[in-house]
Amino acid sequence: MSETKTKPHLPDLTATRVHHIGLTVASLDRALEFWEAFLGVERLWRMMLDRPYLGRHVGYPGVKIDAAFVPLPGGAILELLEYQLDGRVQNPEATANPGNMHICLSVTNAQSAWERAVALGAKPVAPAGPVDVDGGPNKGARAAYLRIHDGITLEMIQPAPGR
């Protein structure tokens, strides 16, 4: 005898776009230095966030967060957050760890982008540089993983010709 599970009714959802991607960092100054230099852009804003709603929103009542928005290619926004709290600890940076995330930027030249990131202090996962993708949906692309500030993984992909 099999049981039929009924799915709960869910309210309608109309997601229209990615609003922003948030990264918690140890030093907002260091993070801004990397992202502004790497992307060749200026932050949209930087401010200390300390409104009463914020602590309720993020789960740390009374918190202050030094925050900035940086424009990403294609119109998305990168939000950088430095929580002003004692006792913060680094998340494990290994890409296989649950909860680990990465940002992937599409670039026109993976080798040049890799060299630029390394010159700005990024640590390559594959020291020889970008790898050629030889199978799957990105076959023909060139890609690289690098560790940037705070152990964050930055991926760059140069799409296959014609894609």
Language-model features: locations:
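Vicinal oxygen chelate
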Residues: M1-T14, V18-A26, D66-A76, N91-R163
